């Protein structure tokens, strides 16, 4: 499993709208692609401008197979409906490793 981890800066007064539009537009589009497993939105109660998106993919290849044109089109639709650009301030990729549990 691969984790796509994005930290964004969003105006505090627009945070709820951002989360709603992100679910309607981005999550819907991502979920239509093979390999999409789930997505979570984390908010930091101490930093009202911070939103973290945690997206789980079955494989890196499936994640990276989304056509760039589709990403650009989705970004354009999101910007048009949200009305403001959310700034990605940090992004990372993680692999989830699981090892057999040793019984004692």
Set out the residue ranges of the language-model regions.
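Intrinsically disordered, low-complexity regions of eukaryotic proteins
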Residues: 6, 42, 89-95
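Short, surface-exposed ligand-recognition loops at beta-strand->loop->(often short) alpha-helix junctions
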Residues: 9-22
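An amphipathic, aromatic/His-enriched active-site/gating alpha helix that lines ligand/cofactor pockets
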Residues: 24-36, 56-92
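Short, well-ordered beta-strand segments in beta-rich or mixed alpha/beta enzyme
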Residues: 2-9, 39-69
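Short, flexible segments with low predicted structural confidence
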Residues: 1-2, 18, 34-35
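Short, low-order "capping/linker" segments at domain edges
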Residues: 95-104
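Short acidic/polar alpha-helix capping motifs at helix-coil junctions
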Residues: 2-5, 15-16, 93
